[in-house]
UniProtKB/Swiss-Prot annotation:
Keywords: Cytoplasm, Lipid biosynthesis, Lipid metabolism, NAD, NADP, Nucleotide-binding, Oxidoreductase, Phospholipid biosynthesis, Phospholipid metabolism
Species assigned in the record: Acidithiobacillus ferrooxidans (strain ATCC 23270 / DSM 14882 / CIP 104768 / NCIMB 8455)
Protein name: Glycerol-3-phosphate dehydrogenase [NAD(P)+]
UniProt keyword Lipid metabolism, yes or no: yes
GO biological process: carbohydrate metabolic process; glycerol-3-phosphate biosynthetic process; glycerol-3-phosphate catabolic process; glycerophospholipid metabolic process; phospholipid biosynthetic process
Gene3D superfamilies xref list: N-(1-d-carboxylethyl)-l-norvaline Dehydrogenase, domain 2 (1.10.1040.10), NAD(P)-binding Rossmann-like Domain (3.40.50.720)
InterPro entries the record matches: 6-PGluconate_DH-like_C_sf, 6PGD_dom2, G3P_DH_NAD-dep, G3P_DH_NAD-dep_C, G3P_DH_NAD-dep_N, NAD(P)-bd_dom_sf
Domain of life: Bacteria
Amino acid sequence: MRWAVLGGGHWGTALAVYLLRQRHMVQLWGRRAERLPCQPGRTDLFPVFPECARPEGLHCTVDLAAAVQGGEGIVLAVPSHALRGLLTHLLPCLPSTALFVLASKGLEVPSALRLDQVLREILPEAPLVVLSGPSFAHDLMLGKPLAMTAASTDPTYAQRVAEAFGSAQMRVYTSDDVAGVCLGGAIKNVLAIAAGISDGLGNGDSARAALITRGMAELHRLGTALGGRTETFMGLAGAGDLILTSCSDLSRNRRVGLGLGSGLSLEAVLRGIGEEAEGVRTAQALFQLAQSLGVDMPITEQVYRVLFEGAAPRAASDELMRRALRSELHVSDDGTPGGAARTE
């Protein structure tokens, strides 16, 4: 297939190189030429992967129309806040039959829309598959095995992406739960910040395990309230991605939490990371959704308070530990397991 990968960061570059290794034709697009990993005269993937050799046949461009011309598939790998603008600019030059693969994670702020919903507002009829799961660009670049989920309301599109991306390195499962796969990939980033804060405070491995487990309860409560399915949240796009992002220092969201828990300001942490950490923006949208839907999300609420209200990380951690005691399998007044309705 002929693919256009839109997004010249680590994830977009890794996906472009991976597709090239699977013998697809690939154009990699980015907004700024100096940030694209195809610098003239260089044989590596500077600046995103300077330690990796540039594969023969990888083409880079800042011309959006040229990138998608003749494309059979378009991979979207841009930050959540850039997606709407990119799609709007894409409209005049869009190939009529292109299959979209949404590989970005997050929620739009301030609308709190899922990213597939953003795409549907602009391209309501476009064939769409959401590709998500526990995966780091670094692992993909180094040829390490991983598994992902390809979700679409049309099973033929999901199968087409599974076949295009699937290999001995990447196992791709299919799903029809687009909402659940999108939400799992977004919510886990905020919970990973919480895990990082806990570790930055020195709370230990036991506390991290508790946060991940109770974070899964929050992911399930909000995710099902927004139309996702339980089995999705227990799978690769939910629990799998949450575990990876919460436990590995390759995770930018975890590193945000580590910095905050160690006493750094948010500005200093983000400056040190130097790249987008989707969980920061997503925390705003999740807090907004939880409040409007009456969903109990105490971990998310404390992350929001640390990020945007100046709450001290230690005080936020202590607040979680001092919550009123209740059954782990709490059922709310509306009969929803886990307390879908807010309970004080």
